A protein has these predicted regions:
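Conserved core segment of the aminotransferase class I/II
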Residues: 1-63
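Short amphipathic alpha-helical segments
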Residues: 12-13, 89-91, 126-128
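Short hydrophobic/aromatic beta-strand micro-patches
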Residues: 18, 94-96, 131-133
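Helix N-cap motif at beta-to-alpha junctions
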Residues: 21-22, 98-100, 135-137
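Short amphipathic alpha-helical/adjacent loop interface patches that line ligand
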Residues: 32, 69, 143
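Conserved glycine-rich beta-strand-loop-beta hairpin in the small C-terminal domain of fold type I
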Residues: 48, 63-73, 83-96
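Acidic-histidine catalytic/liganding microenvironments
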Residues: 79
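PLP-dependent enzyme catalytic core of the Aspartate aminotransferase-like
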Residues: 107-117, 122-158
Length: 158
């Protein structure tokens, strides 16, 4: 487990594993022991501060992300050829582009200034992944450009 993404301190470099199974725990310790450097003081202090005083901030973050998720779902629902999968406990949204007449939706959206993650990275052809953990103004701009890309490429005119 790690608080690094939730509290936006990825450089803190502190994570932990909770494992009741002694055999599995030993394998985990052996496996990651040489891969992960020792935690630094900053990581401990940042994590302690987040655990002791970060609940209000975390709840505000979750509320903000819910608003971004709602905006994303409603917007994609109104763009022909795109479909959203349910987002469960994540700030990453999967958009199906199967109904678009384009071989590579990633490149289509990139031409309009929206850099999404191509589904091929995850063995999901004709899909893209979008990160909603961003200022709402960025998400609004990205959705506007996605809508423009679809409209200018004949999808909305069919």
């Amino acid at each position: 487990m790690s608080l690094n993404k939730t509290f936006n301190f990825p450089g803190a470099g502190l994570a932990w594993v909770v494992c009741k199974n002694d055999i599995l725990r030993k394998k985990v310790v052996e496996g990651v022991g040489s891969l992960i450097p020792e935690a630094q003081l900053f990581g401990y202090i940042a994590t302690q501060a987040a655990l002791e005083d970060g609940e209000h901030w975390r709840l505000s973050l979750l509320s903000y992300l819910r608003g971004n998720r709602k905006l994303l779902l409603e917007s994609i629902d109104n763009i022909p050829g795109l479909h959203m999968y349910d987002m469960e406990a994540s700030y990453l949204g999967w958009i199906s582009c199967k109904d678009l007449p384009h071989k590579d939706p990633f490149k289509l959206f990139l031409r309009y200034g929206v850099a999404l993650q191509p589904g091929e990275m995850f063995n999901a052809k004709n899909h893209v992944r979008i990160n909603i953990a961003t200022p709402r103004s960025n998400l609004i701009e990205a959705l506007s450009r996605i809508n423009e890309a679809i409209g200018k490429n004949g999808i909305m005119n069919d």
